[in-house]
């Protein structure tokens, strides 16, 4: 099992104010590292290479669907690229016994919001979530555990939003 859970955000900014350095860091951490880890996992999992198959779970973001306008468009775009990787790789390696899926957390109470300069973001936006609250890392982890398990043996190229309906 591979869980790609690396992710960074930067300070809130509009696209017109984003530097090339910011974009390079965002895509290197959030997208390119996922590509490289997937590449290595396929080499170690593929039944076509004599291995036992496996499961790859990419931790994307609801931001990939929402866009994060006026805040983190670069983050959303990097996670959108991860979604496309999930689709293409799932199609490419299904016959080799590898399942590839993604989890898209929404407003989850973690330190990533503080690193982006908005430590109260989950509480501030909780009213925009149909369930009326932010989620927990444990709630995301439970979905990842299910996708990694044999209970999800016929699940590939799927996206599970853990976003309270947002």
Language model: regions and residue ranges:
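Alpha-helical segment proximal to the catalytic Tyr-Lys
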Residues: 43, 47, 91-95, 153
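A glycine/serine/threonine-rich, flexible loop-to-helix segment
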Residues: 71-72, 95, 107-129, 139
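C-terminal helical subdomain
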Residues: 95, 102, 123-151, 155, ...
């Amino acid at each position: 099992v591979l869980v790609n859970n690396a992710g960074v955000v930067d300070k809130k900014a509009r696209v017109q104010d984003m530097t090339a350095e910011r974009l390079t860091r965002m895509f290197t951490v959030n997208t390119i590292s996922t590509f490289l880890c997937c590449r290595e996992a396929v080499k170690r999992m593929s039944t076509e290479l004599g291995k036992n198959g496996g499961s790859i779970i990419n931790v994307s973001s609801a931001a990939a669907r929402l866009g994060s306008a006026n805040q983190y468009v670069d983050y959303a775009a990097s996670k959108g690229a991860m979604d496309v990787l999930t689709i293409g790789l799932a199609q490419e390696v299904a016959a080799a016994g590898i399942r590839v899926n993604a989890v898209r957390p929404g407003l989850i109470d973690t330190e990533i919001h503080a690193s982006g300069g908005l430590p109260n973001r989950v509480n501030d936006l909780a009213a925009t979530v149909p369930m009326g609250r932010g989620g927990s890392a444990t709630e995301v982890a439970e979905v990842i555990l299910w996708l990694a398990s044999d209970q999800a043996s016929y699940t590939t190229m799927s996206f599970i939003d853990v976003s309270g309906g947002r």
